[in-house]
Amino acid sequence: MNKVIVIADSTADLSPELVEKYKVRVVPLHVTFPKEEVDYLDGVTITPQQLYDKVKELGETPKSGAINIQEFIDYFKPYIDDGCDIIFTGIGSGLSSTINNATVASREFPEGRIEIVDSQNLSTGTGLLVLKMCELRDKGMDVHAIAEEVRKFVPLVNSKFCINTLDYLYKGGRCNSLTRWASSVFQLHPVIVVKDNGMSVGKVLIGKYAKAVDVQIQKFVKDLPNMDTSHVFVTDSDCMNGEDKQIIDALSKYIPLENIHHTHAGCVVCTHCGPKTIGILYILKTAEK
């Protein structure tokens, strides 16, 4: 059996420690600003803080771009030439052309050497699937068995983020000016739900942001009996007021602290959601009705 290489795109938002521990290879998406002629690589040539600084400097939000077909071919080739098999997952096909581009690129190599799994998710919703891949790889499963097993988890991933401001969604064309105004005036904090290969607004929470964080914790506790607690992610973007610690402290009363992974959202998630975005992500045992 060939050695299996697990590859994720940068939107999986895995921490450097997890990338090293699980031996994950990461290929970056692109980030561009309309006023600049620079093609940044997510997490390589631009960080989330640098992105936010540029938003203030330029007065515009960036655009994220998929990994193109040739980039995938160039990235896959050394591993295939070394006799390895590859399994790749990244941001869902309903949110980016990255998965489709990876699929096209995989056809340039011998059949059966590369498996592409559509996460139908983003951020550490994808990251949860990456960790599953790594664990199955370490059990000695081949690339096809890993892909078959991980696809069973795709509809079970629970990905929800509470956002503090609609400014980034508005500038990115994902909400109208009236909704943005109402959010500002009435302190509305939408919960973004990633489901069925897309993003939608679930609940809209009213009041202080801390209250919205409490609602996320309550949902976590409610889901506990139906949750795979081996890996739970708390993923945030520029939360400077301790919301991340608040959530981790609360979750650690119910599950071992070592099962909670605190990571920071990369530039692609920051592009659409903005600062003070935070989510609790986990895999359910059975799908929500």
Place the predicted regions along the sequence by residue.
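Mixed-charge interfacial surface used for oligomerization/domain docking
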Residues: 11-19, 25-32, 37-38, 84, ...
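Short beta->alpha junction loops
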Residues: 66, 118-120
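Short catalytic-loop micro-motif centered on adjacent basic/acidic residues
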Residues: 6-7, 63, 88, 116, ...
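N-terminal glycine-rich anion-binding loop in soluble enzyme alpha/beta folds
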Residues: 5-65
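Class I S-adenosyl-L-methionine
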Residues: 38-88, 93-111
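Extreme N-terminus of proteins, especially the signal/transit-peptide cleavage junction
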Residues: 1-3
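Polar/charged alpha-helical tracts
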Residues: 20-21, 53, 70, 74, ...
